[in-house]
Amino acid sequence: MTQIPPSRLHSPLDRLLVEAQRALDTVFGNPPAERPNPAGDTPDAALAPAQRQHAAGLMRINHVGEVCAQGLYFGQAAVARDDHTRQHLLTAAQEETDHLAWCADRLRELESRPSLFNPLWYAGSYALGAVAGLRGDDWSLGFVVETERQVEAHLDEHLETLPETDQRSRAILRVMKIDEARHADHAEQAGARILPPPIPSAMALASKLMKTIAYRF
């Protein structure tokens, strides 16, 4: 992910260029992971065509989830009022960059591709993050908690439905699940607001729509 020195982040144009570069890196680039791929030397077992297609669909969903997480966190960080909250969000975003890279690697191994709608997923998530952040840092952190808890739940579902022999995908998802739980815990400790009931339900509905589309496209 392209880094721009803090000393340059003075003008609105500087900040706009930073956000544009982040969007391009996330959606069209191939940002490198800072940590090793959890799949490591795990053997890539042979999968039947239907199994490979299913595994690719699930990993495409997970890749989209990371695109959305990047958009959400960068949108929140752009309007965060507290430096500690901003740094918390950017640190979480860096770990999500690792997830993004790992999922992209696995999609290539499965001879598949990311979602065609990644620009839309990113833009929508960035807008949601900015709106949440404008309500206040406690609201912003509340969205982090709810997002990560919902991601944990769908990672559990994927670990149950992935082909048993697809140990490379499983290794990646297990580490992602640990990271997501930690992000949620840290956000709670930082003062996250509990979101009112309609919001988590709306987020779950949007997530279901995204997963349905991303599985195939």
Curated annotation (Swiss-Prot):
Q: Which molecular-function annotations from GO does this UniProt entry contain?
A: 3-demethoxyubiquinol 3-hydroxylase activity; metal ion binding
- The residues the record assigns to binding Fe cation 1 are E66, E96, H99, E180
Q: Which CDD domains match?
A: DMQH
Give the superkingdom in one word.
Bacteria
The annotated pathway is: Cofactor biosynthesis; ubiquinone biosynthesis
EC number from the UniProt entry: 1.14.99.60
Keywords (A to Z) from UniProt: Cell membrane, Iron, Membrane, Metal-binding, Monooxygenase, Oxidoreductase, Ubiquinone biosynthesis
Keyword Iron part of the UniProt annotation = yes
Does Metal-binding appear among the keywords? yes
Q: How does it sit in the membrane?
A: Peripheral membrane protein
Which of this chain's residues are annotated to bind Fe cation 2?
E96, E148, E180, H183
The name of this protein is 3-demethoxyubiquinol 3-hydroxylase
Name its species: Xanthomonas campestris pv. campestris (strain ATCC 33913 / DSM 3586 / NCPPB 528 / LMG 568 / P 25)
Gene (UniProt) = coq7
